[in-house]
């Protein structure tokens, strides 16, 4: 019904007219009384209206339809220009403006309650960085991504991303992608506790936080700590410093007792399997009575790189070896009741037993031994022979974390408690059970064993375990990193005298070296306990008095007493010049005068000793050990930590200077280098390294107990308890129990539980829990920074990883037309890398020689020596002192390490090797005396054969490594074979640019090697050579040689 057709008078009566309520103030009609009352209370301009003052400022409300747009503006806030559909919404909004606004804009009078609103408002003043919405002009965004998000969610395309399976719509594609995981049947993320699976990793992490008591499900067998998942347990095992790695259930077997552990007390445990090693290296492969593990020393097949069950490892000790006939060994395997009528301990175990019990009183040690003897008699034989009878099933290795391992701490507690009770009752009954005859019999059996054994005592103690095979992988990886991946080849076994120090490589690698080469006194071989109770001063003095002159005394003594810490035998009289003090590993000062007199007595100690032997020998010999000493626990090379301050200097030397070359370590067809030169050089280097304070721990508390063959980190048993447990409880998560090495890692981890994201982006609404993620977000998203530029195609990237991925495409040739595709650029790039590496290598050699040189006259420049300039030749030989033997031998080690790299480079370029042949022949002249240096060149040609023989005798220590035959062929060639015409192709004018740089590097390497060999020759003939004659000869030979001139010119 239209209004113009009917007037009020003619309009049909409305049936709802009687229910309309009329407002007397504004003549509006309402259908209900409540609407009228609300109208009069708020909207109408009556005196009772709460907002009459606000409405007075508005324009009058008109009933015409043409003024509806003006009515909409009546609900607009004057403070922030926001429009509201009704007055009630506007009134609620006005309450927010009554609060105090502390954030004011410096460009306009507006103020805000929140700093984020102020920042967003200030961006609107910057005309270059604001983005307005076309649909709602009031909306201004500081980032285009926020504007696009606003358009998708509020305007066209809102929730435009629909799921094809269920029809559910999403505003973003990421939301749809996350939703589609619900419909997927693949759930790869499984909870390791309750085995519930999830499609997303974030849901699994959220679920794992819900487990409150999951920490009691998975327990670490080494330290007893609880974990919620096996992955966290495996991660914990990599850094586990638990003490049970080195206790009876760990690396050791029957009868071992380590101090400082409450679960595995000082009482010996019988019949324990290798639970600690089984997780990492598989089951052991030796009988219960043998001293050695049966892993090969350094096998050709290199089984340390593979699981232990893939290779059959033969026994170290042959079946006919006298080791199996030792007293007490066969008895422990045959007799059912193990009576200790004669010493059953293997000789290699007595030193470590004494070291393990050094911090306890004599009475406690004797009582401990008595309990061990009673345990051997009382326990069933099945438990003792359990390990030896299971050798047929040893090839089945136990996986890490499996339930097949049966050793647990709870199984041992009952035995420990009973042993403690017996210790209290029978502790005082043991004093009368040891007689000097039994102690002497134990000593004699040890000496007889040492004389008839295939291996020396030092090598017997340094046994090869699975951990050593694991450490060989690390050595191989280091050698492969520096020198290639050709491999190592062992040598035939040498059944001569033993090494007087722990072998660098296992048994078959070293030849027979005399005992007098390397003897250090006053070293402390005692392993430091994890936790010991302090003794009273009186008791410690009594123990030290009673054991000062006793055998196998490893207690700490004053340096003035010159006591041997692990001598095989020692009389009660003071140490004489005929008695030997074997390898001493303490960090204290040495007296070299005493070491030279103690070199020939080890083989003579059989029966002729005095009978005044302390009863502690019997006490220590009653223990039944399988391993000679605690070996450190070896982890993968990635997780190893080098503790150089706790390493012995000899170990540092062996790791630094005795690395293999790119080929074989020692070629099996040639004899090994001169032993005396080698060992004296190492000895001197060890003394020099000990002079640095960096290798001296404070108060000798961190000295490694026994030098291992490959000591990448100190064993846990050699460190005090306070250092092992330091920080373990400090950085522990209170929610899940995880342990972190640093507080920052714990703080970051706690945010995963609390959900805190304190780092908020100032440009958008995103928040981050890690500040680095926020910085990366601002740099890549908002600032569009691309600081990483490709030097080949000038492309820029925001992250280094993207640039690296791009450079790999250049290397693979996927990007054509680049500089990397040309062969010259590749040669120049590799040449620059090699040249930089060689320069740093030679700088290190040059600094080392300069530091150890004692010449009063400074040496000439090396380049000037090579060029052979006559105006700078050293002619004052009388004023320049000759290097002593020790320093020359130190340089010989550096020469050996260098020549191992040079030989490989020379073999790759036979022409370069022939070019440098004359240089080696001319350097042979310098092994002659000063008189012979003045002979005419014709006399020089006649004496080439004699000089060649002298040079062969003075070969340096490592000239027998790979390519030794080729280097000899080069040296055997006469000087007359090459004339100037034949050498002309090697001059600088005939060389191409591609060959100049490699030839120059090789010539420089050869020159350094030959200069160092001169010092080695001088050490071999100290009476017939002087430094002045050598350098004079070098300059004269260089001047006469065309090849050397050409090399110098290059």
UniProtKB/Swiss-Prot annotation:
The CTBP-binding motifs and the N-terminal group of zinc fingers are required for repressor activity in the pronephros. A zinc finger (C2H2-type) spans 21-48, 75-97, 103-125, 131-155, 161-183, 189-211, 218-240, 731-753, 759-782, 788-810. Its main location: nucleus. Residues 397-411, 588-598 have a biased composition (Polar residues). It is found in: Nucleus; Nucleus speckle. This is MDS1 and EVI1 complex locus protein EVI1-B. Residues 371-421, 529-612, 928-951 are annotated as: Disordered. SUPFAM superfamilies: beta-beta-alpha zinc fingers. Keywords: Developmental protein, DNA-binding, Metal-binding, Nucleus, Repeat, Repressor, Transcription, Transcription regulation, Zinc, Zinc-finger. Transcriptional repressor during pronephros development. Plays a role in regionalization of the pronephros; may promote formation of the distal tubule and duct over formation of the glomus and proximal tubule. One of its GO terms (cellular component) is nuclear speck. One of its GO terms (biological process) is pronephric duct development. Residues 379-390, 529-542, 599-612 have a biased composition (Basic and acidic residues). A motif (Nuclear localization signal) lies at residues 420-433. Homooligomer. Interacts with ctbp. SMART domains: ZnF_C2H2. A motif (CTBP-binding motif 2) lies at residues 582-586. The keyword Repressor applies. InterPro entries: Znf_C2H2_sf (IPR036236), Znf_C2H2_type (IPR013087). Residues 564-576 have a biased composition (Low complexity).
